[in-house]
Design a protein with these regions (language model features):
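Short catalytic/metal-binding and nucleic-acid-binding patches
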Residues: 1-176
Length: 176
């Protein structure tokens, strides 16, 4: 099977994306691993990325973001977080996950022992306010749909609290 052919239609506009851990391995079950993502988001936001909505679940995250070169910025985000997360797994001797990452990596990833993220992010261009609202609702209700919480604002690793006027873990851009 070939590499992902999903592309960013217009890399300067907001896109809905899904970033999934290889083989859907549940890595984001520890606050330390989620904090690596938040640190990386904050860095990218300081570099100019706008984050409109997000949710982090145990093995993937959904995101609506925009930057001047979103395709390149998401590639940087994935590369940096992969190195940090693999480093965390190694430092904490979480060998079962490391072995699984190694056994499921793509053949062309021969220059490194582990692949962390699945290829591609399935970017969808957000065209108009109705689509933006629909995607934000989808993102925020993901943990509810999975039965993890009864209300979207109860999921800690989501921008739902921010949209409800409460403090969230990441500053979100509400204007698009």
């Amino acid at each position: 099977m070939g590499r992902s052919r999903y592309i960013f239609t217009d890399p300067t506009q907001p896109h809905f994306m899904t970033l999934t851990v290889l083989n859907s391995i549940p890595v984001f079950t520890r606050p330390d691993t989620v904090n690596i993502l938040f640190d990386s988001f904050r860095f990218m936001m300081n570099e100019g990325m706008k984050v409109y909505a997000y949710v982090i679940l145990e093995n993937h995250l959904h995101l609506i973001a925009q930057s001047e070169q979103l395709d390149k910025d998401i590639a940087r985000f994935k590369s940096f977080t992969a190195r940090r997360l693999i480093g965390y797994l190694q430092a904490n001797r979480i060998h079962t996950i490391l072995k699984e990452l190694d056994s499921h990596k793509k053949a062309h990833k021969h220059n490194r022992p582990h692949q962390f993220w699945q290829e591609g992010v399935h970017p969808e261009l957000i065209q108009g306010e109705a689509v933006m609202r629909q995607k934000i609702d989808y993102i925020h209700h993901n943990p509810v749909k999975r039965g993890y919480v009864d209300e979207a604002i109860h999921w800690r690793y989501s921008s739902a609290r921010s949209y409800a006027g409460r403090d969230g873990l990441l500053e979100i851009c509400h204007e698009w």
